[in-house]
Structure formats: C-alpha cells, structure tokens
Amino acid sequence: MLAKQALNTEIEPLYGDDAISEAIRRMEALEVASLPVVDDTTGKLRGQVSLQQLEHAESDRSVSDMEMDKPVKIYDEQHIFEAARLMLQYEMRLLPVVDKEKTFIGYLGKTKVLESLTHMLNLAETGSVITVELKQRDFTLTEIVHLIESEGAKILGITVETPDVQAGVYEVSIKLNLRDISRVAATLRRHEYTVLTDSSNEILGVDVETRADELIKYMDM
C-alpha cells in the first residue's frame, strides 16, 4: 500500500499568517506535538513548528515569525512501511504527505497506518505463527516456503526481524492458516532449521499480539 492510498485530507496544515494562539489551539485539539507549515500561495511545505516552540513565543505573533524546523514528510508514492518507520522514529501521530513537487496533499494518521499494517500482515486472520532462525549467510525463503506448503499450510504473512549483529541471525515469523502447526515445525526441524516457536495457536498468537502491541505502544504517543 502506498501513502496516497491512506490519505487524510480533512485536517488543515498551518499557514504563515496563522496566529500562534490559533496554532496552539489546533495542536492541542488534535493532540499532536507538531504541525507542518504550508506556503499559502504555492501549497508547498515550508517547514514544521512544534507545540513547545509555540508555547514559548509571544501569542500575538504569527507562525511565519517562528524559526521552523525541517519538516518530516513522506512522498505519496512511498510505501506505508516507510510511514510507520518515520512515525516511530519521530513519535508522530500525523505525518505530512507531499507529491513529487513537494506540494502538501494531506496526512497519514496513526490509526490509518495501524489499520493498513494489520490488514497487510493478516493479523486479524485466524491461524498460528511459527518463528524460524536463519543465519545471514544462509538467508533464503525459497526452501522454507516449499517445506511449509508441502504440509498443506497456506502462508498468510511473513515478517523478518533485523539480524542480531553478533549472532548473525534473522528471526523470520511466518503466519499460517493452521491452528496445529506441529507437523510444519517437525518438517522444518528435520531439514535442520531452528524453530523458535512451535506451540498451539493460543500460545503462538501471543508472539504476534506482542509485536503488534509494541508497534501500537510506540505509535500511540
């Protein structure tokens, strides 16, 4: 999914001639720590200001009088995964979206991004998760996918964690449409794969839910 497919166009950005008092009121109403500032003539993104900056400024001045930060933004053709990364890194509830000309076209909201990720990763689908450890030098999913499908399982989603630098391994979590994945786990072990989780759906579901909860926790700022 691309950023433009989850766009929110209902929330207005700040403009240079907006009063600081009004900008503060809007940020507090939206419960955000910053908002982008857009040129009211060209529609291009000028920068962004934080609530903390505004609270230390004279309330009768305008936003254009403020020293603006470099805006955090995403292009409309970028993937929703990049939006999630930026929101986590900068602790943002609203992420400005621009087109290739850097014209502001809307926002990505935290809730919409989470809904998109949940849909893409099939977190709402019934099934189980199996986590396999792979060494960096041996990293390939082709054989794993073949072995899983040979046991009649359907892969609903795959996530790969950044490898441990010292151990040099990836943790690959694979969501399957089966409740009982004992046969899949046994097959992978027979082919000398290290299976980190191989219990029932109820236990394995905790792994996915924990990862989702961690994402929600960091995005729910």
Named regions from a protein language model:
Residues 50-54, 112-113, 186, 193, ...:
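Histidine- and aromatic-rich ligand-binding microenvironments
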Residues 126-221:
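A conserved regulatory-domain signal marking ACT and ACT-like small-molecule sensing domains
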